[in-house]
C-alpha cells in the first residue's frame, strides 16, 4: 500500500544516492534548501503584512472614533450657529423697529407744531 503524496515530506533517497553518488544527492538538497529559503522569506513577508494590516485596522478604528466625535461637534456647532443667527436677527429687527419709531416720533414732533401753526391762522 502506498502513502499519499505530501510535498513537505522529503522523498526516499533515489538509487543514485544509495549507490553513493554524492553529486546527484547534493543538487536536490540545494534545490530543496533554496525552495525552503523562499518559503521562509514568503512566510516572513506575510507575517509583516498581517502585522501591518492589524496596525492599519487599529488606526482606522481610531480615525473612525475621531470622525464620529467631529460629526457630533459639527452638529453642536451648527445648532449654536443657528441659535446665534436667530438671536442676531431679532436684535437687528428690534434695532430697525426702534429707528423707525424714532423717525416717526421725530416727524410727529416736527410736523404737528407746523401743521397746527398754519392751520390755526
Curated annotation (Swiss-Prot):
The keyword S-adenosyl-L-methionine does not apply. GO terms for biological process: ascospore-type prospore membrane formation; intracellular protein transport; vesicle fusion. It holds the Pfam family Synaptobrevin. The keyword Transmembrane helix applies. Residues 119-121 are vesicular. It is a single-pass type IV membrane protein. Residues 1-97 are cytoplasmic. The chain crosses the membrane at residues 98-118. GO terms for molecular function: SNAP receptor activity; syntaxin binding. CDD domains: R-SNARE_Snc1. Keywords: Coiled coil, Membrane, Transmembrane, Transmembrane helix. It is found in: Membrane. Residues 31-91 form the v-SNARE coiled-coil homology domain. GO terms for cellular component: cell cortex of cell tip; cell division site; cell tip; cytoplasm; endosome; Golgi apparatus; medial cortex; meiotic spindle pole. Involved in membrane trafficking during cytokinesis and cell elongation. Belongs to the synaptobrevin family. This is Synaptobrevin homolog 1. It comes from Schizosaccharomyces pombe (strain 972 / ATCC 24843). The gene is syb1.
